[in-house]
Amino acid sequence: MTIQQALETIHQKLQTFTQLAHRPKSAVTLLAVSKTKPNEAILEAYQAGQKAFGENYVQEGVDKIQYFEAQNIQLEWHFIGPLQSNKTRLVAEHFDWMQTLERAKIAVRLNEQRPANKAPLNVLIQINISDEASKSGIQPSQMIELAKHIENLPHLRLRGLMAIPAPTDNIAEQEAAFSQMEQLFEQLKVAFPHQQIDTLSMGMTDDMQSAIKCGSTMVRIGTAIFGARIY
C-alpha cells in the first residue's frame, strides 16, 4: 500500500468514526507521526494532502524542518516527544507546536527562546492520564497551576491537552481514560475563557475510535501511514 492509499484509508476511518460520534469530520485533525521516517516519505504524504507532521526527536525534527523550508514547502511541525531543558531552544526556534509540556521551567525557557518574528509557539499540556511511572505528563490536579504559568508567557499560546493512555484493547478502559481527558479539557476551557483552547490531542491507530467518541480533536497516526518503523 502506498502512503497515499494509507492516508485515504485513514481518512475513510475518520469519516466513519466522526459520523458515529455525531461530529463533523472537520472536527478531527490528522497528525502524521513521521519520526524515523525519511524526507521522501514525508514528501509523499504532503503530495497526498497531509500538512501536519509530528516528530519525537529534536535534532531529527529540526533537520527535516530545515530540509522542507529549503524546498519552500510549508508544513506544520509538532514536537510530540519528551523534551529536556537543554533542547528547548531548537524546539522554540523551529517547531509550530509543542504537545508534551509538563513543567513550568520548560515553558519559561520556550517562551524566552521563541524568536520574536515568529508567531507564539502553540503548546499542549501533557496529562499522565493512566498514572504510569514510565510516562511523561502531569497529574490532572496540576493542570490549572501549569496553565496559569503558561497564560503569563507572551510567546506561548495554550491550545489544550495531550495524552498517551496506557495501551489496552479493552474499549471500556480506552473510553474511561479518554472521557476523563475530555472532562479535563472542558475544565481548562472554563478556567481560561480568553485562551484559544481548542485542541485535545489523543488517539492513535489502535484507539482512534474511542478517542474520537470522547471528543479528540487530533489523532496521532504513524505506522498506519508510513508502515513499520525504520530505525
Where are these regions (language model features)?
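Conserved alpha/beta-domain cores
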Residues: 1-187, 191-206, 212-214, 226
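Gly/Pro- and small hydrophobic-enriched strand-loop and loop-to-helix capping segments
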Residues: 216-231
